[in-house]
Amino acid sequence: MGRYNLTALRVRRTALATTQCGKPGTRQPWLDVLADIPPASILVRNQAPSHPVVKQRMRTVPGKSKPQLEIKSSAGRKQTSKKPSRIFQPKEIRYEEDQLRKEFFRDHPWELARPRVVLENDGNDHRRYNWQNIQQPGKKLDGESVVQRQLYLLNNVPDMSKGAAYEIARREFYQLRLQEDVERRVAQEEALATGAYFGPDMHTVGMELENQEYEKWKVWAEGENQAMEQRLAAFTGSTGPTEESGESEDEIPLIEEEDAIGASEESETEAPSGPPI
């Protein structure tokens, strides 16, 4: 059967073979039950079911006094080219607010940098929220508030489009953000008026003073090092590298002894002989 594991289906056969071989032990009481009710053997693997996106809308129907609830489900795009090894993988679970959340954070990427509180008491905080208003008690205003407010407008306001719901939720979000900024500035001005200090802390000031002292010591150390080199040069007689050639006296190449002897012999042979005395 290839890689299928049929060990569980052959438990009764293995137990009977063990008993017939004469191994010590009593006959298991579940052998007869297993013979009457064998385990299920499903060798056909079904593909994972897809999860359609369910959308709820309120539509105005001609001839009706009240808007009618309309529920649509879309399966999404079909993936025709898929590897055989990925056919049986679980399908992605998608919700309508996923696309709304993607659009909002695409327009407001810095909202992701704000700290968020994801801790809940019992996991049912979302059931106590009423998204008729974007601001909820006990919940900090963030991008998720805009998404849930937009979804509420789409599900409960008749003939509401996604763009119009996004504009309404976004306008309310901007107004509350502006109100928070004003409250923050007013609180800072009140604190400054009562003697609060919002400058750098003690550690930052200490590090700045330490950096200044280090720079002063660095200039003093360079001067001391230069004076020490000048005193050593006065004792050794070295004047340092020349400016024209760029070579010091210690780096002047020395003439080897053999070359000097050969040069003196050549000069003696080439010199003319004078008159005898």
UniProtKB/Swiss-Prot annotation:
UniProtKB keywords: Mitochondrion, Ribonucleoprotein, Ribosomal protein
Any one GO MF annotation of this record: structural constituent of ribosome
Pfam families according to UniProt: MRP-S25 (PF13741)
Stretches with biased composition (Acidic residues): 244-269
Localization, UniProt: Mitochondrion
Segments for region (Disordered): 48-85, 232-277
Family the entry assigns: Belongs to the mitochondrion-specific ribosomal protein mS23 family.
Protein name: Small ribosomal subunit protein mS23
Species: Ajellomyces capsulatus (strain NAm1 / WU24) (Darling's disease fungus)
Organismal lineage: Eukaryota, Fungi, Dikarya, Ascomycota, Pezizomycotina
